[in-house]
């Protein structure tokens, strides 16, 4: 009996010890602090953003003091409005007019990642705890934001110094066929989303039109072969402009299941405006063009960033791309957003196919908990050199917030694995640097000649 009691007491102590350890927030430990400090010191390469030239920063409000960026603008340019109601700014009115209604927009959002990811920006950039903000503090915060956007100094300082970003891929969906660089840290890419739907010139605006692009270069588009020649010329020009990859967001409009459609079926659709196309004809054309783009992606060594998951859930599972991935081993596929919510499936795809990379862009801001779980699961099933990240937003505060949230999420995921004995600390530091910077340099070798920072620290190791 005594022996039984001793064994029972020992088991109880072990259970209590385990419960205490499990209840400890890893972010309060010295281990987490070391890993987070190491990740903070990495000049990151942000593989996806939508930062416009400064004069075109979106979501500005017409206030009683003129047009500018407001506290409302920060939330309007974030993911908050995709999940929660965001009261519009009353045109020409004061901050107080908006705040007396808008302050209640956050009541049911406090636990959501789409709200919480912005808190580090208010805390670190402005010294404000938004969870406990008063009307007076909110008014002052709004005034400071408005003043900061009088010129581009604040924006550039936040991106390069506070967020510690060295290079940023900018998906200029508002001018897809231009490769201008508005900032020292800009990296161009070629967005092929609309090209894959271009059965007729009426499909395009002037800023996106391959038909206008062809005319400006003395090329004609009279049939599908002409169109394909112009598309390939676009790839040639993109490479010459140092574009580093391709991007598609067609999953917002249609399924990711692309069949290898023969050319004659695509020719049926070509030349028809949208109002003359059947849904089947449009899909056939898009499917055909997708496979053409896959071939050009391999030929011109432009890895292909593909939106998967959240946005339009129907048909957006990355599993629908597996046949195309398997049939095009020389094309480098980058599955955006980790396929949220299908993070396990995305990891399995990367595990089985060496031509697949995963970009965690957007994931922590959709669900911090799922983001942390994804990092841990992916690192268990695939090599660490095929994971990346991106901020995916439109102004300084959003960029800082998404960057800080990602560094925190990644540091927490790595620290937990170290604490459980699943990873050495020095290996965790290396993996963190790979995800934030080195993996992009490896996948996109052109980036090396675009680096401009002189103060990049060497790889840190645990002592």
Question: Where are these predicted regions, by residue range?
Answer:
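Histidine/acidic residue-rich metal-binding segments in metalloenzymes
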Residues: 153-159, 222-248, 255-356, 370-388, ...
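Boundary at the C-terminal end of the N-terminal hydrophobic targeting segment
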Residues: 18-23
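Divalent metal-coordination and catalytic microenvironments
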Residues: 48, 168, 246, 307, ...
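Active-site beta-loop-alpha junctions enriched in small/polar residues
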Residues: 50, 173, 191-197, 249-253, ...
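Alpha-helical scaffold segments that flank or form the walls of functional sites
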Residues: 40, 61-183, 209, 224-242
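Bacterial N-terminal signal peptides
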Residues: 7-17
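Histidine-centered catalytic micro-motifs
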Residues: 43-56, 304-309
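Mid-to-C-terminal alpha-helical segments outside catalytic/metal-binding sites
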Residues: 25-45, 54, 61, 69-125, ...
